[in-house]
Amino acid sequence: MTVALGFRDLGLIDYETAWHAMQRFTDGRGREAADEVWLVQHPPVFTQGQSGKAEHLLLPGNIPVVQVDRGGQVTYHGPGQLVAYLMLDVRRLGFGVRDLVTRIENTLIALLADYGVKAAAKADAPGVYVDGAKIASLGLRIRNGCSFHGLALNVDMDLEPFRRINPCGYAGLAMTQLSDQAGQIEFSEVSARLRAQLVKHLDYAEQATLTGGINHYD
């Protein structure tokens, strides 16, 4: 069991700032570098993964579209969505890609169960769903045995922009969020519960709070 998983709470941050910092963190880390999770929210943005197709961007309007290097297709990020970027040395952890995805999905399913929400994964469509509606998305990149990008959980946000795309490449895919399933919730509490579940499901002994920003990576 790895000793500690470090968490850096960055608040509301521009998507491209976080993305480029993730790339530099991953490219510059040594074999002994500690793993980190960055917890963020983003201003409104669509991101198009490596499998993305232009026809799945229906009416983006004034929301910017960023082509990125993660797996998957198009998704939306906005305030009220909890995004966790997972910078993990998966070789050191001994995880295969499928195993890592399953562990992340199980993390989210357990978190939602804490709020009395019954969720499930789908074998052919990564992410987590409640009664067929998607509540959390996954998108990862593995480089030199290390992961970056991560998960996005809809907590309490404006879901309208999802109707401007085919989320994750699926036309008409319904989206939902935790506040619609569990009523009034505290975003900070959801974040704290996510931290605990990630530590458990990724086999770390404990969590650590990291201070400082990521400006030295951008």
From Swiss-Prot:
Enzymatic reactions: octanoyl-[ACP] + L-lysyl-[protein] = N(6)-octanoyl-L-lysyl-[protein] + holo-[ACP] + H(+)
Subcellular location: Cytoplasm
Keyword DNA-binding included in the entry's annotation: no
Biological or metabolic pathway of the protein: Protein modification; protein lipoylation via endogenous pathway; protein N(6)-(lipoyl)lysine from octanoyl-[acyl-carrier-protein]: step 1/2
Residues bound to substrate: 70-77, 137-139, 150-152
Keyword field contains Transferase: yes
UniProt record, GO biological process: protein modification process
Top-level class of the enzyme under EC nomenclature: transferase
Annotated site location: Lowers pKa of active site Cys: 134
GO CC annotation terms, alphabetical: cytoplasm
Domain annotation BPL/LPL catalytic: ranges: 31-206
EC number(s) recorded for this UniProt protein: 2.3.1.181
InterPro entries xref list: aa-tRNA-synth_II/BPL/LPL (IPR045864), BPL_LPL_catalytic (IPR004143), Octanoyltransferase (IPR000544), Octanoyltransferase_CS (IPR020605)
GO molecular function, a single term: lipoyl(octanoyl) transferase activity
Gene3D superfamilies referenced in this protein's UniProt entry, alphabetically: Bira Bifunctional Protein, Domain 2
Active-site residues (renumbered): 168 (acyl-thioester intermediate)
Further remark: In the reaction, the free carboxyl group of octanoic acid is attached via an amide linkage to the epsilon-amino group of a specific lysine residue of lipoyl domains of lipoate-dependent enzymes.
Family matches, as NCBIfam families: lipB (TIGR00214), PRK14342.1 (NF010922), PRK14345.1 (NF010925)
Database matches in PANTHER family: LIPOYLTRANSFERASE 2, MITOCHONDRIAL-RELATED (PTHR10993:SF7), OCTANOYLTRANSFERASE (PTHR10993)
Role of this protein: Catalyzes the transfer of endogenously produced octanoic acid from octanoyl-acyl-carrier-protein onto the lipoyl domains of lipoate-dependent enzymes. Lipoyl-ACP can also act as a substrate although octanoyl-ACP is likely to be the physiological substrate.
Similarity comment: family membership: Belongs to the LipB family.
Protein's recorded name: Octanoyltransferase
